[in-house]
Amino acid sequence: MGHFYRFKRGDQVIIVSGIYAGFPGAVDGAVFQRTIDYPDAFSPGYHVIISDGPVVTVRWDQVSAMNIGLEDNQ
């Protein structure tokens, strides 16, 4: 895994930008593919399961740690 991937499966995150900004969710996995907000470019990112919602693909810089115990700026 590269330095872009700071979260692992099950980590609680909040989406900080894009269509789903402000939505909490859980990381399902790290991916390298097109995302919902950047469909024309392949990027490192995550599949995030939105609480009571869909699974979305977001870039690595569109999520932030929800738990205080996780380092957000590594």
Q: What role is predicted for each listed range?
A:
Residues 44-74:
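Intrinsically disordered, low-complexity, charged/polar segments
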Residues 1, 37-42:
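Polybasic, low-complexity nucleic-acid-binding and compaction segments
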Residues 1-16, 34, 72-73:
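Mixed-charge, Lys/Arg-rich low-complexity intrinsically disordered regions
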Residues 15-19, 50-52:
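Short acidic, glycine-rich loop/turn motifs
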Residues 22-36:
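Short beta-strand-centered aromatic/proline hotspots
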Residues 8-9, 40-44:
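A short, compositionally biased
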